[in-house]
Design a protein with these regions (language model features):
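Hydrophobic structural segments
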Residues: 3, 7-270
């Protein structure tokens, strides 16, 4: 047997960074990202030899240090470090300092944000809640889009739904807007920041929106309009990206060593 799939199991081999990118973009094309987003190779060399990939949600100092320690040649994150127009890269600011550190250590940097939300995260999250009769919450391209709506596995109280979300996504807590004894049968789930999804979810007629980063006014307004909201936090649902991409790369590119950031909330509640 020849090729990557036929190489000896347990051994890792160098690949061009571009080869890895092509395999990722075959499954998660960049054109499915929202127009405001910044995805793809954000720093580094497409011809660089890579044998280790480090996967994380964000390119924090801790993540970059771990990527360096692991010997990674490619850092793969969900959230892009660079969003707006970057006019300079210097050690005088936080973003520039991190980019310099990556480049100095020979680590290319790739972000896959809303293209992954559209083509991976939404269905994965809906599946973890056992939603049925699912539909796209807000279309982006070719019938694919952000979030999903569907029927919960059973009718339950809003409080029970909150506990269900905590259990399925391994969360210590969630915030709930709405009466805890309200019965819910349908839900919209939109991982990440869900304020912009409140209106589409309300128009879809679901009983509860499950998302993150719901501000005070959006939460109380939606509850007053009859749609409950469960705020699982920005990280709370999106952390599933790390393990999902690990499985994807291990299956698609078994010659690579895949390392991941630990799954934990980036803050503490005291």
């Amino acid at each position: 047997m020849t090729g990557i799939a036929g190489r000896q199991k347990g051994r890792h081999y160098n690949m061009k960074c571009q080869e890895i990118i092509e395999r990722i973009e075959r499954r998660f094309p960049r054109e499915y990202a929202c127009s405001w987003d910044n995805v793809g190779l954000l720093a580094g060399d497409r011809q660089q030899e890579v044998d280790t990939v480090y996967i994380a949600l964000d390119a924090t100092d801790e993540v970059i240090e771990a990527a360096v320690s692991s010997g990674a040649g490619l850092l793969l994150t969900h959230h892009p470090m660079i969003f707006g127009g970057l006019k300079s890269v210097t050690a005088d600011d936080y973003t520039g300092e991190r980019l310099i550190r990556l480049i100095k250590n020979g680590i290319s940097y790739y972000a896959m944000h809303t293209n992954y939300d559209v083509l991976g995260m939404a269905d994965l999250a809906a599946g973890m809640l056992d939603l049925t009769e699912t539909e796209v919450l807000e279309e982006v391209l070719d019938g694919e889009g952000i979030g999903r709506t569907g029927r919960l596995p059973k009718i339950m109280t809003l409080e029970e739904c909150g506990q269900f979300v905590k259990e399925r996504f391994s969360l210590p807590n969630v915030k709930i807007f709405g009466e805890l004894n309200k019965m819910v049968a349908t839900a919209a789930i939109s991982p990440g920041s869900g304020k912009s999804m409140a209106r589409p979810a309300f128009e879809a007629g679901v009983d509860v929106l499950i998302s993150g980063d719901i501000d005070h006014h959006t939460g109380i307004d939606m509850a007053d309009c009859g749609m409950a909201v469960i705020d699982a936090g920005h990280y709370g649902i999106e952390h599933i990206y790390i393990e999902d991409m690990k499985k994807f790369l291990e299956k698609e590119l078994p010659a690579l060593k895949i390392c991941t950031a630990p799954a934990r909330q980036p803050f503490q509640v005291i």
